[in-house]
Swiss-Prot record:
Protein's job: Member of a two-component regulatory system QseB/QseC. Activates the flagella regulon by activating transcription of FlhDC. May activate QseB by phosphorylation.
Cytoplasmic-facing ranges: 1-12, 178-449
Enzyme class: transferase
Keyword flag Transmembrane helix: yes
Reaction(s) the record says it catalyses: ATP + protein L-histidine = ADP + protein N-phospho-L-histidine
PANTHER family linked to this entry: SENSOR HISTIDINE KINASE YKOH, SENSOR PROTEIN QSEC
Protein name, per record: Sensor protein QseC
Cysteines engaged in disulfide bonds, as pairs: none
Amino acid sequence: MKFTQRLSLRVRLTLIFLILASVTWLLSSFVAWKQTTDNVDELFDTQLMLFAKRLSTLDLNEINAADRMAQTPNRLKHGHVDDDALTFAIFTHDGRMVLNDGDNGEDIPYSYQREGFADGQLVGEDDPWRFVWMTSPDGKYRIVVGQEWEYREDMALAIVAGQLIPWLVALPIMLIIMMVLLGRELAPLNKLALALRMRDPDSEKPLNATGVPSEVRPLVESLNQLFARTHAMMVRERRFTSDAAHELRSPLTALKVQTEVAQLSDDDPQARKKALLQLHSGIDRATRLVDQLLTLSRLDSLDNLQDVAEIPLEDLLQSSVMDIYHTAQQAKIDVRLTLNAHSIKRTGQPLLLSLLVRNLLDNAVRYSPQGSVVDVTLNADNFIVRDNGPGVTPEALARIGERFYRPPGQTATGSGLGLSIVQRIAKLHGMNVEFGNAEQGGFEAKVSW
């Protein structure tokens, strides 16, 4: 198997064709041999019987047997006569030979019991013969006509060889033609291989499928789809890296400034304490940003979900509200959960769906004023997270969900990645996320399925 795998496709196809053609030729030869021998036996048996009947119609009483047997048949001047093709002898009932062909007929042993076709041998020989025995109409004579089996086999072999040898001779010609045609048909594959070998790693240009066999076209189309996905991934990663570098630069610069302020505030404990508090807050913001960047990067690399389960959304929302409750209380914000539907379940990855709800709640609490309420409502086909904040302008609403985008004028800290993470998780679960301003004021996010 390893040897054949190292061979080219053209050589392998040629070997397969050669093996199949050889096996087919051998099977055809066997079938042709069987059919031909059966037909030859039937034909020559009929010939023997007709010749014996013809001899039985002779007036054997008037034949001068001595003179007849003395006259050995002459060879034809032109052509070939096989002495094994046919022989005969005529006996009386007591076994006395009265007539033969002057050749092999002299050695035919007499048998008074045989009638019809029988196999036997000549006197003093081991070669098998085919005989037909017949009694003359007057009952006085026994007529036997024989033919050597080897003659029949030679005749059958000559017929079969005449039919099959031309095909055997044509096989090398067919192989040459096949190799030429295979080389011609595989030329598009060689061209495709060259295009892949010379392809720029950053190229997004699809492979040309012109002239490619239909059996290989799905491979080319799959490669083009792979190249498109790879290019999109590379563009996404480059954009992500660029945005991440830009977003990390500001908090890191701020951390450096606060560190320098703390170092220069040895004589002012109050300023030093304030700088350290701001440094701690900056570290928290940077940590949150890095966590969100890593989360978004992992989500981008997912094409399908693993470890999915049936998740009761009622339990999911209740646990998420409990998780955010302490933070909301510190900000003097009340979080309320309203269940307009029960026993609603969705198939998904528990940790990711929990992250989706937590990000929506965190965003609502972060941008809501003190003393306001965040409402979480579960319906039969969606759930809604609504705050009492100022909402967003139509221009900003159109860009909500873009990575690193934050509406202008925001005082609350943030990275602009939370809602991007929400959209990505929802997409992985086949859900739809809609952002908008609530009719009674505030910003709302609706997750529907």
